[in-house]
Amino acid sequence: MLIFIIHYHRHLALHLMGAFQKHSNSISPPPRKGFI
């Protein structure tokens, strides 16, 4: 159960990070293209 929570949290964190990256890219040019 704990592993599932950690996995879900990681997935959610990556999703939020991706959304934040998109938001930053819309404001300023992307510092690194390869970064997901």
Curated annotation (Swiss-Prot):
Superkingdom of source: Eukaryota
What this protein is called in its record is Uncharacterized protein YGL006W-A
